[in-house]
Amino acid sequence: MPLWDWEEDVLADYSRLVAEVHPDVVVVMIGANEFEGHVLEGEALEPGSERWAEVLAERAGEAMAQWRAEGAPVYWWTTPRMRDTRFLTDDLIAIWEATTTAWGAGVTSLDSMVVLGDASGAYRDRMVDENGRLVDLRKARGVHFHEVGADLLARQLEERLVADGWLVDD
């Protein structure tokens, strides 16, 4: 179970960071801990339940309000699918997509599985790199990714930021 308070820790941190940094853009990837068994005011939130989805959707909107407080555009990566299908990443993606759609202009969803997934967007542990070598994308539990996965995501973001005029392609 997460050891933080949503309003006092998370939202306060988001607000403080935006106020201190005044970001030109905000980049977000969250969701790996959304299956850890949250309790809200004594109510256990079963991952995948309707109530769980309602709470996460509300929190996604609250987070977005903090990130967009000074008008910076938000680039939100979808939560990468994980090896263990008990991690209901497709449910999370639906919540994140609904949030980005609701906020409209200035909020962009980036599909992490375009670069981390196989040709159909499904989970994969390894990939063949540009040198023809088989390299690991994910760490042992199939949740977090190795540097090569992070590099793929960074390139995906860079391409989008160039396309949107935030960066200049050398």
How would you describe each model-predicted region?
Residues 9, 13, 25, 47-51, ...:
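Extracytoplasmic/secreted proteins, especially bacterial periplasmic and envelope-associated proteins
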Residues 21-26, 69-75, 103-107:
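Loop/turn elements at helix/coil->beta-strand transitions in domains of secreted/extracellular proteins
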Residues 29-39, 63-94, 111-113:
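Active-site segments of SGNH/GDSL-like serine hydrolases
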Residues 81-170:
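Catalytic His-Asp segment of secreted/periplasmic serine-dependent ester chemistry enzymes
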